């Protein structure tokens, strides 16, 4: 069951990541482009988590006399490391936009934010009933993505009424700092 939910989450996230890259360029939003890079890392992590989860269900053999259950923990560790790397990239991009602000297409951001809430929310819901630490780590991260998209939606609505070009990168930094905080907590749990 866990492999099936990880598979669904993987393909949803990968498809949405591709859409985000094109959409972020189209609406000129660093928050959406940053999230696309972040979601690419998530897709890689989900793919790894899916593979390692399948591996963790193998029976013990001569090579691994206690079985493969620890592969699920390895998936959580890899997930955390990828998220830390992606977060560092996101912060560096957003800081650049604070010094050289650029206008974003607020209407386009609203559309992507709604899609982001729906896609990530569905994937998080599918994984929320998981039993492995790997599934729980992925589910928590997808819920953080939902919160990030809600914040993007709020900022996009505000941008409809103002011309504050600092909101997009500032939001990107806040979301990323929140994600980093939670990843470090889960990384400690994994180790």
Question: What positions do the PLM features span?
Answer:
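Acidic (E/D-rich), amphipathic helical modules within compact regulatory domains
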Residues: 42
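Short, hydrophobic transmembrane alpha-helix segments
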Residues: 22-35
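Histidine-rich, glycine-flanked metal-binding segment
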Residues: 1-25
